[in-house]
Every structure is written in C-alpha cells, then in structure tokens.
C-alpha cells in the first residue's frame, strides 16, 4: 500500500497545461497509431539480428509512441532499450490525468493495459534518468527528464550498443538546435537514422532543421517511408566529427575507468563473491541480460550479513543542493521500489514474496541542529510532491497514527522492506531467467589472477578461471590483497526488536529522526540503530539497546507511546555496514592502489600532473570489480548500483550520468585529490 500525499500537493498542473506541454501527435489516434505501428515494425525488422536494440525518442508527447514501441516489441530473442528524452518532467498522476481527459487510450485496449503497467511504476517528476524494466528485462525504458542537451551530453557513448534509430516527435522537431543534434550523433551508431512525423505540411521539418540533422551525418526520413535504412553511408568528414566528440568525452573521463569491452555475442564467466542484497541484485540484472553467474556465499543461506534485518527503511537521501548524491538516491530509491513491485506482482508461479509496506517515511528533527538541516532541505528545492512534502504537526500525527506532535518531511512512496527476503526474491527470479549457481557455505579466502582469468580459493577448493569477478561481500569487502586499500569503514549496527503493543502497535508509517522506528511486522517493531565504527565484536550489547530507546525519547519526548517500547526481552540483531566518507556506494573497476601510488611518485605535484591524471586511464585490476559500501541505505542504493554494474559488464548503456559514475567509482578518493593537484 502506498501512502497518498494530500491533494493540494499532488495536483500542480491541470489538463490544459499538460496538453500544451505534452501534445498529442495526431487527433485521429486510431489512424495515426496504425501508421505508427507499421513504421515501428519496420524498425524492428530492420534490426532483427541484434540481441539488444537501442532506440531513442525525442519528446514524450502524450505517451502513445512510447507505449506503441513497447507493444510492437514481440521478438522473444531481442531486448529493447528505449531512451525517451523529455524536457518537462511529469509524474504518474499527471500522466493518468492526461490520458483520462484526452481519452486517447479508450479505443486501444492493448495500449491501455501497457499504460496501466507504466503508471504502476510511479514515474516521478525528477531531473535525470529513471529506468523502468518490464517483462523480465525484455523491454527497458529510460525516461530522461530535464534539459535535453544537458541530458544527452551527460551520457557515455556505448560502443557495442549505441542508439540505432531516433524518432523525433513533431512538437520538438524544429526546436532542437545544432548542439543537440551533435550530442544525438555522439550517442548513435555511425549508420543511425532519424525518423520524423510529418502528418501534414505544417507539421513537417523545416529545411533548416533537415540541414542541421544532415550536417551531423544523419539520414532523415518521414516515418511513413516504406523502407528503414540500416546502413546509410554518412559523409566521412561528418563521421570524423562524431568520433572526435566521442574521443573528447573519453579523454575527459579517462580517470574513471570502465569495464573492458567484451563481445556481446560471447557470454562471459562471472563470479560474484557475497551473499547479500548486492550479490542477488547483480545476479538478477545480469540474468535479465541472459548472463549466467556463480555466487559464492560463506553462510548457509543468503542475507546473513547487513542484509539480514527484519525490516529496513527505503527512502531517498536528499540534500539542500540536490547534488549528485541527492539525485542518485532519488533515482536509486525509485528503481528499488519498482524492483519490489515487479518481484511481488509477477504472475504465479513466478511471484516471489517480500514482506514490505510502502506506508511512507516521516522524517522529523530531534534537536536544533537537525531542525535547521531539515528546514534547509525542505526550503531549498521545489521537491516533487511524490518524492517528499512538508507536513505540519497535525498532519504528521495523522500520518503516523500516533502522536508525535512535530512537523516533518513526508516521503509518500517510501516505506519498509525485509532485506533478506528481498535478496532471496531477487536470486529466485534470476534463477528463473538463466543459470545462476549458488555456492553456500563457501568462504573465499583468496583471489588470484592468472593469464587465463581469476581463480577463487577456499580452504579446500579452487574455482575458476573467471573472466570477471565482483566483490560484493559486504563487511569482508577489504579482506583481499586487491581490495584491502579501499577507503571504506565498517560500522556496527544493533537493531532492537520490540513487541507491538498498546499505542505503539498503531504506528502506521516509518519514523526517522535520531534513529528510526518501523510499523509492526509479525508482532515486532524494529528500532535502531547503533553506529559503532570498527567494532571489536558482533555480540548483543545491552548499552546499545538502551541507546536505541534513548534516541526515540530524544526524538519524540513526553509521548505516551514511548512507555510501550519494551526492551526487557533483549531481542536484537547485530550487523556491520560498510560506509564511505561521501555516502556514495562503490561500484566499478577495482582500483590498483599500489600502481596508483607508484604512478603518483612519478607524477607528483608537477605542472603536468593534473593533466596526466585527467587524461590517463587510472590503474585497475583487470576483470575485478567492486560493488559495496552501501552503508545504511543499501535497500535504496543497492539494486540500481547492481543494475549499473551489470550494464557496464555487458557493455550496455548505463542509466547514470558521467558525473555520478565518477562519484561511484571505487578509485574516487585518490583521484579526487590527484585531479586537484593535491598530495595523497
């Protein structure tokens, strides 16, 4: 169940405003959709041999083109990635209002069904990319909201899977300037084509726009043309300009190494070390791409580490600046939420149970400093109401269903999820899609790189070789020689389990202040958590149990329901989360720290050193990757980090911008200093 925002916050634009921003392409939808379907079928037929077809669309319009692409994708041996660029962000409520008021879906029941599935994913009006995955990965839709040139220029060219074809909707056809055309060209295959929609003379492309597209090497045709060219021969000079753009991009971000490009037709042997949320979701994202994996877990079952809690809050981390950290966590939270929905709503027998409740999260302050911080977050941005909105004390009491008597910030799409069930469900789905071999009670003590690949060594066995190995082993992330220099710290967390009774049992949303308190699940609330750096042991600690209770008293003083929190049973769970200083997860190539230090000695604080580090690929351990450092918000960040690493391992477009990828890179702590000309 999703907590609903109040109506005044939810409705920001009425139908006349929406239809102006997201115009229908044609008034006669049935006739237009018939021609559109024929055109889209030709596109799929022209690229039928590709296992992944990447298409681009300029403009969302009223959404019919997007839905029609989805409907037309019927090839069971091909996956579709549709990237839609729309300058005006829109949310699910407004999309539904647009479709209901226009009745554009009334006569197309097959599109109406897809529209309902799209709305179920709760697209939100945030800047950046939202990845929506349907049909076990056969159809993926990337919604890029915000300034189109900014969105295009922020993306990395995918050499193996570039955009093969573009559809430009009429209301944007003559408004895209030359810089946008070049950015489209940068992300496209050298033989990519552009289709426009000219239903009448007034809606066609201007001669200037046609010339601009052609000046970037694009073949431009109306969508009604009988033939889709798949191998036009662009001008060699224009192709050179595209390649220069890509090289400039690659050079500017050389310090942020990506996975080595592998053949898309040759499956790679991938080993994942770890048995928690990160491992399971990486296996799922790879399985959706048809890639088999082997998982090595030291425990008797999944989710015995930081992923083993009964309940965990899932909500975005927001900052006053809405910087890369804030934008990443919004994207990641929404992606994870959609994963939970997809796993729990799949048709039987593929449905996988996950205890969860999207009952909302209510964030409040607990002292003067935290109040100033929360006020700054609330007031500094015009946050979409589906992300979060301010509530007064009376509204907060109503949402919590118990008295807290404090104003706060309410996240209506958020809530709680059972982490270990979430991990188990992801693995179960992955095993339904492809071969995923799970090695339980198999502790990897050492990893070794030879010319033929990586070997994993236990006390009794040696596994391998593997072309790619991912370290997703949580608290043990730094146990190997190749990873022991990672700048990441372990923090102990004790979560208290308290009986649901009296007023406390009525709690209806997750409370987050100095610590958190969840609604009851199977007769218990979760209250936590302690935060102890580099713990000496993982035994139950009575002092931390009392500290958890004290945090609630500090957060909500003098409330009667505090007396209902019974700690006498000493019921708790202790885990370790790995935390980075900047709160970003670690995702990407494992840095070769000794080599970085060695190179630093040769390029230390000279005039050329900053340029060297900016333009030289940073040293990495070939074929070794890191997925960890999820901290206290792994439920929100883990699945998207895993999805992005899976895309990287398979040389596919990544649903994050270049700046955010740099923030996630495991080498960032060293490179941040080196790029500024500072000493290590």
From Swiss-Prot:
The keyword Ubl conjugation does not apply. Pfam families: DAO. It is found in: Cytoplasm. Its cofactor is FAD. It catalyses: 5-aminomethyl-2-thiouridine(34) in tRNA + S-adenosyl-L-methionine = 5-methylaminomethyl-2-thiouridine(34) in tRNA + S-adenosyl-L-homocysteine + H(+). Its EC number is 2.1.1.61, 1.5.-.-. Residues 273-680 are annotated as: FAD-dependent cmnm(5)s(2)U34 oxidoreductase. Transmembrane segments: none annotated. Residues 1-267 are annotated as: tRNA (mnm(5)s(2)U34)-methyltransferase. One of its GO terms (biological process) is methylation. GO terms for molecular function: flavin adenine dinucleotide binding; oxidoreductase activity, acting on the CH-NH group of donors; tRNA (5-methylaminomethyl-2-thiouridylate)(34)-methyltransferase activity. In the N-terminal section; belongs to the methyltransferase superfamily. tRNA (mnm(5)s(2)U34)-methyltransferase family. HAMAP family: MnmC (MF_01102). This is tRNA 5-methylaminomethyl-2-thiouridine biosynthesis bifunctional protein MnmC. It comes from Shewanella sp. (strain W3-18-1). The lineage of its organism: Bacteria, Pseudomonadati, Pseudomonadota, Gammaproteobacteria, Alteromonadales. The gene is mnmC.
